[in-house]
Swiss-Prot record:
SMART domains: SynN, t_SNARE. It is a single-pass type IV membrane protein. This is Syntaxin PEP12. Plays a role in the sorting and targeting of vacuolar proteases. GO terms for cellular component: cytosol; endomembrane system; endosome; endosome membrane; fungal-type vacuole membrane; Golgi apparatus; Golgi membrane; SNARE complex. Changing L271D: Increases ubiquitination by TUL1. It comes from Saccharomyces cerevisiae (strain ATCC 204508 / S288c) (Baker's yeast).
Amino acid sequence: MSEDEFFGGDNEAVWNGSRFSDSPEFQTLKEEVAAELFEINGQISTLQQFTATLKSFIDRGDVSAKVVERINKRSVAKIEEIGGLIKKVNTSVKKMDAIEEASLDKTQIIAREKLVRDVSYSFQEFQGIQRQFTQVMKQVNERAKESLEASEMANDAALLDEEQRQNSSKSTRIPGSQIVIERDPINNEEFAYQQNLIEQRDQEISNIERGITELNEVFKDLGSVVQQQGVLVDNIEANIYTTSDNTQLASDELRKAMRYQKRTSRWRVYLLIVLLVMLLFIFLIMKL
């Protein structure tokens, strides 16, 4: 049996390599997903830095600083931007998943599965940092509310004290006049500003939590794609291993056959030599 015959049939694909495939659509989508994923990961990294900075302000007890509100606004904008990118990349992933397996080679199928898994990982990371950010902002709001309540109590106490002093100063009081005591205009303005910020943050936190719930539906779709692609790649790898095992077994059998053929040929030579010697011996006897 020749080597070509032995390694024919089912193992032909192994020696000829993966089937040729040219899918411009897959290549375009792969590049789009990779670019979108790069942008998402960069934005997530920035959001993580913003969240860490906000935590440091909480640790210092300085939640009323103007920079806290600036970071909060930028963080909320980042979350909205990343959410839009997630939805966009999910659309690209669905298009890429819709490409028929028959039009892709094994390398492309594995590359597709890796991209889908990377997108899934980034999505989970985004969900995690969203939850961290909302927890941090809840702490900021709690501290801000406590500070605002303390300021309000201090102002009320100061007003009461002022009223008592004016009531006790009868010598300087004009009969029939009405005492009107107002909070300092600057303090009133700051109080209203801080109160408005707290309300805005509460609304933003609610919006983010609602966004997390909405994106969970996207993640379910993505998780289904990941599972399908994972099964497909596992089957490909199993086929590769099976083919490799079959090839190794065939190679072993071929080596055994070749060794047997060599031994057989060697014995044939020995037998031929013995026959020649015997014929020569008979010939010499007959000559005598």
